[in-house]
Every structure is written in C-alpha cells, then in structure tokens.
Amino acid sequence: MVIRRGEDWGRVAIAPSDLVCASSDAELAAHVGDGKTNIVVTGGDMWRTIGADSRVVVSGESATSLPIDVMKVEFQREDQSIVSKIAVSNIVLRPTNFRGGWLRGSLTVVANAQFLGQWDVAPRGHPNDGRVEVTQVDRHMGVRQRLTARSRLSTGSHLPHPLIQTRSLKNFVCESDDLAQHALWLDGQYMGRVTGLSIEVCSDEAFLWM
C-alpha cells in the first residue's frame, strides 16, 4: 500500500532471517531483481533518502521496516533488442547527439529516491508514494543557467525554473528515432545507447530494514 500524505511510513517489526545487504543502489536493484525483498542498505542514494542510518540490523531483533517502490524498466538497444531491468533510485537519460555532457542538450532524470549523488533532485518525492518524479531540462537552457541550477541542487532549491519541467507520474515512456539516440544510466550504471524506454512504478516491491 502506497503512503498517503500525513501518514507514518514503515513499521517496527522483528527482522526476518532472510535479510540481505546492499551497499549501493545497483546492488539493491540486483537483489530486488533476484526476488529478495528484505534488504539492509548501507550506501547509495536510497540509503541517503531514508536517513543514512548506520545501525546494524540483526535477524530476530526489533527493527524498522520501510516499504519502497521500484521501477520496472524496459528499453530498446541500438541493435533493436529489448532489455528489462529493475531500478530503485534514479534513471538518467541524455541524447548522444550533443557534446558537453549535462551542460548541453536535454536531460531527463526519473527519480524514486530524493537524491542523485550530492544533488537533491526530487525534494517533493517519496520512495513509497506509487509515483516517480520526472525532471526534464530543456535543450535550450544555457550553460550559465545550468551552472547556477547545479549550485542550487545540493539544497533542492533549483526549482521552480522556466526551463526545467517536473512531473509526478506512475508510468513514463520516452521514444526517439535513430538520429536522437539516448545514453541511459540506471542507478549509476551505464546501460549504453537506447532508442526507446518505458518505466512502470511497482509499489511495495521491497522492504528496507534499519
């Protein structure tokens, strides 16, 4: 059940015997993809989002269980093959026909976690609200404006901005032709160039223990 505004998140319970640990978002996503649902996180953007707690969780002892949503991702590679993956924190998509990294061209961040590294990219989001926060930077946004926005990202004060669009969605689809292929990152892992992407938010797919 997704969290609603004003409700408490999580519950205190006895930690189960099938706990596994994840020190990064990619490792957390891999556990979920393998069908493991009870996870202790010790690093990554999701870990920071839930409070960066360093407490040791022991099976059979009392701990806090936090349900989270995950993102089921399907994308099409350059060779037209279709790949399905799980992501837990962030998805980054950037056209490959612009040079200059994030300083040039459009940029899309789909966030389930509040943070992307040191950046507070989704201050209004929650990892168990049944939605993702989609932030899209317009390709016409200048370098100086981007540098100014970056300086504000650490505090989440980069919004609102007329050239940065934000949406809260249950599903997200991005399609492009061969002339506008995108580079894709899932939870910090580079997936290569893609020509299509779809994301479905799945609620209560894992429980983080702290």
Question: Predicted segment positions?
Answer:
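Glycine-rich, charged/polar anion/phosphate-binding loops
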Residues: 89-98, 116-122, 157-160, 184-186
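Internal helical hairpin/lid segments
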Residues: 102-157
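ATP/nucleoside-binding phosphotransfer catalytic cores, i.e., glycine-rich phosphate-binding loops
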Residues: 136-210
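A general structural signal for short secondary-structure junctions and capping/turn motifs
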Residues: 61-63, 98-101, 123-126, 163-164, ...
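A short, structural micro-pattern
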Residues: 65-67, 101-102, 126-129, 166-168, ...
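Short hydrophobic-aromatic micro-motifs
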Residues: 84-93, 106-119, 132-136, 174, ...
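Exposed beta-strand and adjacent loop surfaces of beta-rich binding modules
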Residues: 68-70, 131, 181-183
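Catalytic core of DAGKc-family lipid kinases
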Residues: 1-114
